[in-house]
Design a protein with these regions (language model features):
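A short, hydrophobic C-terminal helix/tail in secreted or cell-surface proteins
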Residues: 169-173
Length: 173
């Protein structure tokens, strides 16, 4: 309750944070269509709101989808990717989901799409004789403090905080 701004860790420590910003900056400059796919809980909605506002302020051609819990289920799925592709979307960015969407991201990549993941959930793994083998997607950038290679000190960020790096570092139009 009595924190200071200096108590916040440097968001540049988030693995792939700068890569994600660089990709988005290029997509904005190229006038590429970007779709944010959030989650239906409050963290997903706020994450989506933060990122849509940041991208619009930077001059992006951006829209968003919040999946229907009953119809679409949780997170990124093939139906949402196919819909984005049909709509001429170049880049899909997830908010508060995507870390476990290995096959779905592979599908988007096969369609030639750029995929950026912002998430805070645990990285999926396979346990082989007591050894955790972490699963990785073919996303172009993944911002998630739970990644093994991520040096961000606060692993329990919410999804909205995981998109904060983009919000803080994208240029404004």
């Amino acid at each position: 309750l009595n924190g200071k701004i200096s108590d916040i860790a440097d968001p540049a420590l988030l693995k792939d944070g700068q890569r994600l910003v660089d990709i988005l900056a290029k997509k904005i400059a190229d006038k590429a269509k970007i779709r944010i796919i959030g989650d239906y809980d409050i963290d997903g909605v706020m994450s989506t709101y933060i990122l849509v506002k940041a991208l619009k302020r930077a001059g992006a051609c951006v829209d968003y989808m919040i999946p229907d819990r009953v119809k679409d289920g949780y997170g990124l799925n093939v139906h949402l990717i196919d819909k984005a592709y049909e709509d001429g979307i170049d880049t899909v960015v997830t908010c508060d989901n995507g870390i476990a969407a290995i096959e779905e991201i592979a599908h988007a990549k096969e369609l030639g799409m750029t995929v950026l993941v912002t998430d805070h959930h645990a990285v999926p793994f396979e346990d082989i004789k007591g050894i955790k083998i972490y699963k990785e997607s073919k996303a172009d950038a993944v911002v998630n403090p739970h990644q093994i290679e991520c040096s961000y000190p606060y692993k329990e960020l919410c999804g909205a905080a995981a998109v904060s790096y983009t919000h803080l570092t994208l240029p404004t139009k």
